[in-house]
């Protein structure tokens, strides 16, 4: 499953050497076309609806709509089915990749707003994070750039800013990925979470994040 945004879309470009991938996602976009044509996406090893690309809707170009039109490999289902965490979990080795606007030092994820300004809905992020966590061999992943606005703002933040909401709670978050590394927060203490997240923040912001963490007794 890939959520909406530049990061999930970019992941598709690096899957060209994989084999026997399957798709169960609320949404699919243009990236699947090339992967199907290369034989990367076959869905043959899926444990739920093998041979089918399962989704609720598509978002992309005319080429994508031509691809799905009368395509027997496409299985469109309502979100009550695709996004049900227990349904998601029936897919063995389910990997859910979703993005975020910011992640605080305790592991809380905000994906829809910056302060009081809303940029989008949060879609099926929580559903797929929980479903992948329940899946045998599954991996729930939050992926984001470490900075925004040309490197002037850290996306690993001391705390979710005022007015913003928590999309995925610290209790649900497992893997967090930036260009500086990968950490697994599941089952970690607040001290461990703060240390791990500071390590994948942009180096320019690590010192101030550490100062905050010490002042607020995270470290």
Residue ranges and their predicted role:
Residues 1-219:
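Conserved phosphate- and dinucleotide-binding cores of soluble alpha/beta proteins
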